[in-house]
């Protein structure tokens, strides 16, 4: 659960088997006022004294009979595979207890699936908590070294103690980035609101929404595909070349044929006819006007050469 950080007992304390831990997950008399005593008070500084846990009805209060100072330590049986949260939340509902009870060799993914399974009644966990989940691969261990009196715990029971809703306020953002990533991969990428680690929330995306967003980004990164029918038949918008001069217009075979037919009937066009041809051939009026000017110059040049060629042999026969 939230506020119970995922701190491996065996990783933090190499001589973990030396400590005598009661398995609160077992169905024994330890549930009704069982005590937790540490056999090595000299080395384990934050778990000294005896603790009594009274479970009567929906009362989830923790009675601390210790007179010393320091942080509270609530540690379930790490080596026995029990779970304190399973007993604290599911003592009135066997389905909840079964869903929270995990073997010692469970993985993070299976633990997350059991916590989010519908068999846990109306228990709402994890998705609305503001701190990392308390499942750990390899054990049902729950350790809290930063639980103080200012922790906000709101419990509401329903259905004869069948479901409880607990919301914890995170007091210490001591979880590492690797634990966050493993937790995200375990429970399907559901966004967990975090106040201290906002960048962790940004990395989480929903399944369908994340896939759709990825596809959108990929489509935006690729240039749009241009089909042949999307291209114009000519280049009319770019009138300047690389050297600042007007770009040479490349007329298509159809455009040239239509212009030649029009020039054959009318060497000079009116403005109205020029607009009609421009719309019919997808050209501008300026291009039509320039083409007719060039065509008239070529026609005059051809006529001049033809007249000169006809006049030269005639002059040779003159006396």
UniProtKB/Swiss-Prot annotation:
Annotated segments matching region Disordered: 114-224
UniProt entry tagged with the keyword Transcription: yes
Family: Belongs to the Antp homeobox family.
A GO cellular component entry from the record: nucleus
Gene: hoxb5a
Protein task: Sequence-specific transcription factor which is part of a developmental regulatory system that provides cells with specific positional identities on the anterior-posterior axis.
Source taxonomy: Eukaryota, Metazoa, Chordata, Craniata, Vertebrata
Pfam families named among the record's database cross-references: Homeodomain
Official protein name in the record: Homeobox protein Hox-B5a
Subcellular location(s) per record: Nucleus
Domain of life: Eukaryota
Listed GO biological process terms: anterior/posterior pattern specification
Species of the source: Takifugu rubripes
Compositional bias annotation for Low complexity: 128-155
DNA-binding region: 244-303
Motif Antp-type hexapeptide, residue numbers: 226-231
């Amino acid at each position: 659960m939230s506020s119970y950080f995922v701190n491996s007992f065996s990783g933090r304390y190499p001589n973990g088997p030396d400590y005598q831990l009661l398995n609160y997950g077992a169905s024994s008399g330890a549930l009704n006022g069982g005590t937790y005593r540490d056999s090595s008070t000299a080395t384990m500084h934050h778990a000294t004294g005896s603790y009594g846990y009274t479970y009567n009805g929906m009362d989830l209060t923790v009675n601390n009979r210790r007179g010393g100072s320091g942080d509270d330590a609530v540690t379930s049986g790490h080596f026995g595979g029990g779970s304190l949260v399973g007993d604290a939340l599911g003592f009135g509902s066997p389905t909840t207890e079964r869903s929270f009870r995990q073997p010692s060799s469970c993985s993070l993914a299976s633990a997350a699936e059991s916590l989010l399974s519908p068999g846990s009644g109306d228990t709402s966990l994890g998705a609305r908590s503001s701190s990392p989940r308390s499942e750990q691969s390899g054990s049902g261990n729950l350790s809290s070294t930063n639980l103080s009196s200012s922790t906000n715990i709101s419990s509401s029971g329903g259905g004869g103690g069948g479901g409880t809703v607990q919301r914890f306020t995170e007091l210490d953002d001591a979880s590492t980035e690797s634990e966050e990533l493993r937790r995200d991969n375990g429970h399907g990428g559901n966004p967990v609101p975090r106040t201290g680690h906002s960048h962790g929330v940004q990395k989480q995306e929903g399944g369908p929404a994340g896939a759709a967003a990825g596809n959108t980004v990929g489509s935006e990164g690729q240039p749009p595909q241009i089909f042949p029918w999307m291209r114009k038949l000519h280049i009319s918008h770019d009138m300047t070349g690389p050297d600042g001069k007007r770009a040479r217009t490349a007329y298509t075979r159809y455009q040239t044929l239509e212009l030649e037919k029009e020039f054959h009937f009318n060497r000079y066009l009116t403005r109205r006819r020029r607009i009609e041809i421009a719309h019919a051939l997808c050209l501008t009026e300026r291009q039509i006007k320039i083409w007719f000017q060039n065509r008239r110059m070529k026609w005059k040049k051809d006529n001049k050469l033809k007249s000169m060629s006809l006049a030269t042999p005639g002059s040779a026969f003159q006396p």
